[in-house]
Amino acid sequence: MIPAKYSPKDIEAEIFKFWDDNRIYEKVKAKEGKKFYFVDGPPYTTGRIHLGTAWNKVIKDTILRYKRMTGFSPTDTPGWDMHGLPIEVKVEQELGFKTKRDIEKYGIAEFVQKCMEYALRNKDAMTEQFKMLGVWMDWENPYMTIKAEYMNAAWWTIRIAYEKGLLERKKMVVNWCPRCETALADAEVEYWDEEDPSIYVKFPVKNEPNTYIVIWTTTPWTLPANMAVAVHPSLEYVKIKALKDDRIEYLILAKELAESVLAKGDYKLWEIVETYLGEDLVGLEYEHPLSDEVPLQKKWRHAVYIADFVTAENTGCVHIAPGHGLEDYELGVKEGLEIFNPVDDRGVYTEEGGKYAGMFVKDANDEIIEDLYRKELLLAEEKIVHRYGHCWRCKSPIIYRSTEQWFLKISKLKTLMLEEIDKVRWVPEWAGSARFKDWVSNAKDWCISRQRYWGIPLPIWICEKCGEMKVVGSINEVPWESDLDLHRPKIDEVVFKCKCGGDMKRVPDVFDVWFDSGVASWGSLAYPLEADEFEKLWPADFITEGHDQTRGWFYSQLGASVICFSKAPYKTVLMHGFTLDEYGRKMSKSLGNVVEPEEVVEQIGVDGFRLYVLTSAPWEDLRFSWDEARNINRMLNIVWNAVRFAYTYMSIDKFKTKGLRSADLKVEDKWILSRLESFNKEAYDAMENYQLHRVVRKFFDFFVEDFSRWYIQLIRPRVWEEKDSPSKLAAYETIFKVIDKAFRIIAPFAPFLSEWIYRHVISEFKDCKESIFLESFPPPREEFIDLELEKNMEIVREIVEAASNARQKARRKLRWPLRKLIIETRDEGVKSAVKKMESIIKMQSNVKSIEIVNEFEKELVLKPNYKVIGPLLKARAKDFVEYVKTLKEVPETINFEGLELKGSEAIIAEYKVPEGYEYAEFSRGIVYIYKELDDELRKEAYAREIIRRIQEMRKEMDLDVEEFIESYVEMDSKLIEGWEEYIKSETRSIKLEFGETTGYTKEWDIEGMKIKIGIKRCSSKSG
């Protein structure tokens, strides 16, 4: 028996146990098939999974299950990203550490061990969460970035880069986190709005009293490192004579910005005294505004230079600090400026910072502004809210500073990388052609070094004596005396002897953690230590991650792969979106809008969760809505009830499938089979194009709308026919075909329900394999698709729905038969469909006859839509009423007293029809019903009402479908005269008596009439 209610928890518990007890995953994985190399983008082992991580793994699991069911043997090794700041910062928080000094005091070895333990502990917890979502992966054999064979792949990659001249150490301005005291890649910087100072500063021009170049900055702390001013060569600049506080000043700035800047400085009177192009200002020298506070500045020349990156914004004169900005740095290198960086790793000024030495740079802003004000060099001071970069892990504001770092020369690879992007299949296409290409086109050399502890150590050793460099490309090159451990500080103890006799010691840096995952497509295969799997599988057939990975994992993989193999490491990339709340906001604890996967599973089950997240187009952001999630569960209940209905009757008749006999199929059977194959074809096409959302949507359209709400209603009378009736058997064969095929299609999406239905329903009526996942995804049988039949049935359903709408207007319930239904249409397709399926329309609309007419007697009545015109026209609405009276039809657009309105919105069109009729429109015509009832119709109506009540009472008594009863009705028997036998057959009553009731009795209100009904179970099921 199938339980009356769909219970996801019970189903999941049973299926989990079945899979585990019978090692179903292992049996499915053991099947031979074509190669399909999937690489799992490794999540950081930083804690519990969130909604987005869950969605990501469900997408992957669905695709892998589909591939297994379509003749492939996909790799399904889960990956774990276990190094880097994501782990370090979490461990620091656990230990209460604030700075790197705390780590070094605690001990690097001890800290690294804590990071290892933390990463492994979270890997285990997250594994259980993924398993809870029904994700089938090789959880016993994951790839982990902390394993020696994986770390070896990173070392080998850097060795290749070194051999190709693509690895270099250089001084460069980089993103820097002063809390973590390390360089960061662009992909590791998160931006959000922050308030900062916005100041306009006057730089005194040398040898020109009271003359100043005006600059603007939001980082006053970089002014101690100022080395130049940049202007645009072709921008027009002016020297302005201005009066302020009885003092004459001469200000140099961009002409088009002068008025707004002077207003900020509260200059009352001013005039332009000179005009020139930016290139004319080149070489103009100025005195550093803080040379007294930063004495080192007195030894350098400060002047104006040209730069194309300058724009006509703020003042048009840009303050240049080559030690604190990338464009500034590049200009400094070009012009031979000092790359001055008086800031240490902690973001604190060094002794070179003069007066500000020992101060954290951000804390120095106010003092620097005060000094400028005191020296009368502060033209204006404001606050600005702008997007500012923050460390992706500790969330501290970053700074820009020049430091010695190790770089991969992406600039030399960019052309090849862009060519390789074009060879990859991107889903959606614009993920590659637009988003990713834009990122790569603007990419700079990749800073791969990090000044941290928990990561893959850079395999670079440098001789202390002669500076000779050695890049180790394999862990086999390292002399080990004990257990192999490539992590710090053990690896730091390894010393090589240089040819010069000196000691070669490892540079202290570790890899950018994005480089770890960047080698995943070969590192996960232990290449190059082991080559067999790599040579069979690489490159990856498929990967999928969120759209943030265009500048993360997609990029790091492409860069590393082009270095090693001169080609992309993946063939197909599916880019998916983010999970947001229903208002489109990022989920965060501070907003209180975080939804955990477990919460959703608790309410709607694992299959409900999977189907809900998979309903959304993968590349769009998923706006989580509890209402929409619960709606999935409501639809699954409809699916369950449809299967339960089928199972109940088919098992009563001990049905066993023998295959479809086309000669016995009725029009509704052929239609649902056509719809099944259309769904099958659409699902197959969608899956081949990674459009998972289309499959889920089409499944519910088909199984809920077509099968449950339509086909089952059409065949209900047939299941009551004799056991061996060809009509009944054809219905059963059709139902079985639908359930069998539909659940094989949806199995990758809803594995628990599909497996349960397969084991408890499908296996009852045919010999089955041990698991639905040992079956094949069904190929579409296009010869069964009859598009004309589908189109005709669509017309019929529209007509039936219109008839239902007309009934509602007439207040006539569907159980009450009507004498006549008239269809007004000139559409030959509608006329043809009605003639072919007249019996279906009659049955579903509960009418005795149908007429088709080209035109029905009616009068068009037009009325203003006051809800629309009232707020718009107000007092003029009366005039609009008069205007409507002049119309014969609804115009497409209305121009009324200068206001343009849509006719269909401003005017309500209704028809006045003959007395006794009601109507409703459909897309190709109008349906009219004759609503008046005669005595014969009333008798049938009351009979149907009695049947419905008895059937409800049978359910309340929990009677089996085949059980017989005795029925007693306390009412005037003349009201249902002639319908007694019909009532008995429909309710399985062996007796129907009128008068005093007995047994289980209830009083009912039927159309205002109080009627008592009593029913009794017969002594045997056969009656």
Residue ranges and their predicted role:
Residues 225-227, 235-344, 373, 414:
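Catalytic alpha/beta core of large soluble enzyme barrels
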